[in-house]
Structure formats: C-alpha cells, structure tokens
C-alpha cells in the first residue's frame, strides 16, 4: 500500500515540476527580490528602532507564498485558455515593481540619502513634492 502511495505522490510531484518548469526563472527572481526586501526591511527596522517580531516575519513569508500562488495561478489560467500571450510575466512584472519599490523605501530609511527619496518621488509621480514623499515614508515606518 505504501509503495503505491509513494509512486502516486512521486508521479504527481514530477508532473507538477514539469508543468510549472517554464516559470522557474520568474519564481527565482521573485525569491531574490523578496529576500532582498526582507533583509533591507530588517536593517530599516533596526535603524528606525522598530522591534522585529515573528508576526512581521510571518507576514513576509505569507506575502512570498501569495506572490508565488498568484504567478502560478496566472500561468495555469494562461495554459488552460491556450493563450499565446505570456500574461503571467505581466503579473510577475507588477509584483517585481512592488518589491523593488519596497526595497527603495527601505534603502531610503537605511541611508538617509536623498537619492532614494528622489527615485521614489519619480516612481510615485511626485517629483516636485519631496517633502510629501518623506512624510509618506515616515508614516509607513511608524505603521510597521
């Protein structure tokens, strides 16, 4: 009985690995960005004297799992609808953008440099209002 269950499980696992193989590069880049966001977030929290709790770390892991699920579901929908359009790459691009924005926010807190604030201002379309970006960043750090 156990041999049968083991063979079924191994076959199902092999099918999943083969089915999602085209997404490995997207998931690898996503994982690198999430880890970079996590590391810079820890440094930013320490700089802002904010406690690092297991709840916040759990939030990061859940966020990463939700990102992976969103990309894989988009890929599955694309395959099921037989689209010749890589829609999952657009979903991944949006998620990459969110993670890169979060990394820049953390770097702005860590470095106290105007360079990252200017980049954030351009991304958010508020390049003339640097004080507004700094206030929003301070407000976000207080919320964490």
Q: Positions of the model-derived regions?
A:
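Mid-chain, well-packed structural core segment of small domains
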Residues: 62-96
């Amino acid at each position: 009985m156990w041999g049968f269950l083991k063979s079924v499980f191994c076959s199902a696992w092999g099918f999943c690995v083969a089915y999602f193989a085209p997404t490995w590069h997207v998931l690898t880049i996503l994982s690198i960005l999430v880890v970079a966001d996590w590391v810079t977030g820890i440094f930013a929290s320490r700089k802002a004297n904010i406690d690092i709790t297991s709840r916040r770390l759990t939030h990061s892991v859940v966020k990463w799992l939700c990102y992976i699920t969103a990309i894989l579901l988009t890929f599955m929908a694309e395959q099921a609808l037989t689209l010749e359009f890589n829609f999952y790459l657009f979903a991944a691009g949006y998620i990459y953008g969110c993670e890169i924005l979060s990394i820049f926010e953390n770097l702005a807190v860590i470095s106290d440099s105007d360079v990252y604030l200017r980049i954030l201002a351009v991304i958010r379309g508020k390049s003339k209002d640097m004080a507004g970006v700094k206030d929003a960043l301070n407000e976000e750090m207080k919320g964490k």
